Curated annotation (Swiss-Prot):
This is 7-cyano-7-deazaguanine synthase. GO terms for molecular function: ATP binding; ligase activity, forming carbon-nitrogen bonds; zinc ion binding. Its cofactor is Zn(2+). NCBIfam families: 7-cyano-7-deazaguanine synthase QueC. Homodimer. InterPro entries: QueC, Rossmann-like_a/b/a_fold. ATP binds at residues 10-20. Catalyzes the ATP-dependent conversion of 7-carboxy-7-deazaguanine (CDG) to 7-cyano-7-deazaguanine (preQ(0)). The keyword Transferase does not apply. It comes from Clostridium botulinum (strain Okra / Type B1). It comes from the Bacteria. Keywords: ATP-binding, Ligase, Metal-binding, Nucleotide-binding, Queuosine biosynthesis, Zinc. Pathway: Purine metabolism; 7-cyano-7-deazaguanine biosynthesis.
Amino acid sequence: MNKEKAIVVFSGGQDSTTCLFWAKKKYKEVIAVSFDYNQKHKLELDCAKDICKKYNIEHHILDLNLLNQLAPNSLTRQDITVDKSAPKEGVPNSFVDGRNLLFLSFVAVFAKQKGINTIITGVSQSDFSGYPDCRDVFIKSLNVTLNLAMDYEFEIITPLMWINKAETWKMAYDLGVLDIVKEETLTCYNGIKADGCGECPACNLRKKGYLEFEKYLMN
């Protein structure tokens, strides 16, 4: 297994950017892969491109526009408004069926062609917002499936799996990239960079985590 190279599933948001710089500390070569799935917050791809260009990281954007045809949701459809809070039953309408399944599968195909075994993704079960494809059991299951499907030894690493947003901010701080994550990323479902719209679930989670992180710094 090649332990010197890694591929990061990179959206240009807080979590994946933190993982990207975490990976840069641990691996000699890091490649970022992003996806265009006709997301309304497509500005995140510009953030991803800018970050990779600025910090000299090889970057690829793969076309997954068909995802919008298969799974209508509030992140890709202009006629569906993002839920401001999680529903009592079921998943939020911002959940894109099959997104992480497809992202990781396509990245695995890409990784094998590059002779890379390690795939890094910023999913978290602690702050998973009701998304079933952010759970540890899903990642472990998919890891086994990909290994069997391609007769190849992949290792999917999830640095944020068991930490919350405040701890993710602390990780960025410890890595020396707090300002990069705070100012140059896009987490907002409404496509507003940095602090975002302040109203969508992603912005609320990000802000709540940052306020908790600030309390930690003051202690």
